[in-house]
Amino acid sequence: WSNGEEVTANDFVYSWNRAADEKTAADYAYLFDIIARNYDGSLAVEATDAYTLKITLTNPCPYFNDLMAFPTYFPVYQKDVEKADPDGKNPGKWCQEAGFVSNGAYTLKSWKHNESMVYVKNPKYYDADNVTMDEIHIMLSADDTATYAAYNSGDLDFVDTVPNDEISTLNGKNSDFHIIPNLGTYYVGFNVNDPIFDGKTVEQAASMRKAMNLLIDREFIVENVGQTVQIAADSFVPAGMSDGNGGVFKTDDISYYDADKTGADQVEEAKKLLESAGYTFTDNG
């Protein structure tokens, strides 16, 4: 740990059980569902010695090593957690200010909320000799224009986003501008309890949703909104998702949107679906 104490297997037993506990309300608690449970509800994770964990899974999991590389599986310092939140009412309080104990390459030296963070090299890190930067300053801002201006003025060495209207100017014309792939899907979801579905059968409601799906011009959004070579989604699962066995899940997925159809084809099919749901169209639409 950054305070010099040794990280042991028991730190992981504590941290994983804490993250999986409903009382913690961790966003990614479900990632521990692959681990079996003991009779008392705790995870079937045992520290057989100071450096060894025995983990019992509910079933074979080829991607378990990948799961353990996810931050939710990282250890937290039990003394800090319990000191900051003795009654368990605010599980995240221990890390809401700078100075908490951690075990990464850097420790958080200062944190001005919504403004900046300063990280310093952790001399206790197991591989500290290969950590080349002594200090990192991070600007916190949701304003792309402000961060981009700070970059251009030399106040920042790196920014991970730029204003959309700058993309066409930078892409392919500035050697510092790079587009990095990101695994994800932007989608529209429906509140099926909305009054718009009142009085509709299950089939009619499904037709309405399918029609909206057909009427979204993905290519227009990719080209004019995203502008960074995104791929029009033809499935809920994004391209490049691993299937857990070394393959790509997307290749076996069933597309729900045919990117080869023309816009006119999509509109006509959507109109038929809406008509089947009880909508009528006039010459004016």
Describe each model-derived feature in a short phrase.
Residues 11-13, 29-83:
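Surface-exposed binding/hinge segments that line
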Residues 4-6, 11, 145-156, 172-173, ...:
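Short helices/loops that flank or line small-molecule/ion binding pockets
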